[in-house]
Amino acid sequence: MKIFRKASELEPNLVSIKDKGQSIGLVLTMGNLHDGHLSLIREAQLHNEFVICSIFINPTQFNNENDFNSYPKTIDEDISKLENIGCNLLFLPEVQEIYPKGLAKKKIVNNFRNILCDKFRPGHFDGVTSVVDLFFNMIKPTNSYFGEKDFQQVKIIQDLVKINHHNIKIIQCPSVRDKMGMSLSSRNSKFSNDQLKIFDVLGNCLLYTSDAADETTGV
């Protein structure tokens, strides 16, 4: 697996790939990779001749500096997982590489805003769409893969593509869940054992309610 940290190193390889007529599948991540991320890589491998994964903890999508600073970082393990799964290329830039003129974000998408996650994390999706826009302009993938776990994010990025990147196809992939039914997330490691026990109970209650509703006629 090739690893590049600078756009200037990445660009000649992208030119070579595209000159060969190969399709590019892109999976954008912030690292601390889990089976959910790897499922996106596998899906990209099924439908593309070349797969790129990026790892970049984007500071402009965090509302809290402590949250940014404490975000899990497991780069050695991440590289090993990507090599084992057969990812072709890892783009691993530093903040200065992506934001050479300083941190900046802009509002690109207006739909699906002021509700759900965006209501409680103002500016978060401006940071997300700004960095995704930068990566799409840099890499110009054929397809890019996102998990359904981040439903609002997927919808907003689909709108971003309609506005700025008409040739990129956004592929929405099913969430991968743990044995308790919780969607895998890099932040799950922050939960305490007591919090996980509460989720286990709530998850079972939701499953029971769903099964009961399915069995009830007229619901």
Language model feature labels by segment:
Residues M1-S210:
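Nucleotidyltransferase catalytic core that binds NTPs
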Residues Y208-V219:
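Single conserved hydrophobic/aromatic residue that forms the stacking wall/gate
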